[in-house]
């Protein structure tokens, strides 16, 4: 069902809408992962502040989803081990750890903003295609009623 020379078929529009829907879903999953990373960094910074304040007890999540907490006592120290990326970790003083975490958070926030921009473009294109498909469907329904 071609719309003329150089036109695009209805099947092409449907395939493009399907592709964009899957792409949008993928972007949304990635966006969620980035937001979870930002939240984890904020939690790590709060833990460092707790250590810096001299508080000797803290609640620590045992699992990633927060189903289990443990009260840990005897937390003292002036150094922590921080993730640098890939498989690299470093033991650094508390202030350096906060600087590293702040830098990482900035990087992730920029990536999240870029991803959000891409998500908005993809959603806009998807909505335009859906509008076109709805117009085609309405025109076909009117033609059928007119027969």
From Swiss-Prot:
An annotated GO cellular component: prefoldin complex
Keywords for the protein's UniProt record, in alphabetical order: Chaperone, Cytoplasm
SUPFAM superfamilies, A to Z: Prefoldin
Chief localization: cytoplasm
Superkingdom field: Archaea
Pfam families: Prefoldin
Gene Ontology biological process terms, A to Z: protein folding
GO molecular function, one term: unfolded protein binding
Residues making up the signal peptide according to the UniProt record: none
Subcellular location as annotated: Cytoplasm
InterPro entries: PFD_alpha_archaea, Prefoldin, Prefoldin_subunit_alpha
Protein purpose: Molecular chaperone capable of stabilizing a range of proteins. Seems to fulfill an ATP-independent, HSP70-like function in archaeal de novo protein folding.
Subunit field text: Heterohexamer of two alpha and four beta subunits.
Family, as annotated: Belongs to the prefoldin alpha subunit family.
Descriptive protein name: Prefoldin subunit alpha
């Amino acid at each position: 069902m071609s719309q003329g020379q150089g036109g695009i078929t209805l099947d092409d529009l449907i395939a493009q809408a399907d592709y964009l829907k899957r792409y949008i879903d993928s972007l949304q999953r990635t966006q969620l992962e980035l937001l979870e990373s930002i939240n984890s960094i904020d939690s790590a910074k709060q833990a460092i502040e707790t250590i810096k304040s001299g508080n000797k007890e803290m609640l620590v999540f045992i699992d990633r989803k927060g189903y289990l907490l443990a009260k840990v006592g005897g937390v003292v120290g002036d150094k922590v081990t921080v993730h640098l990326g890939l498989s690299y970790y470093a033991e650094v003083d508390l202030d350096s750890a906060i600087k590293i975490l702040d830098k990482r958070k900035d990087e992730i926030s920029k990536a999240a903003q870029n991803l959000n921009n891409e998500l908005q473009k993809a959603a806009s294109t998807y909505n335009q295609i859906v509008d076109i498909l709805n117009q085609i469907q309405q025109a076909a329904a009117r033609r059928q009623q007119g027969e």
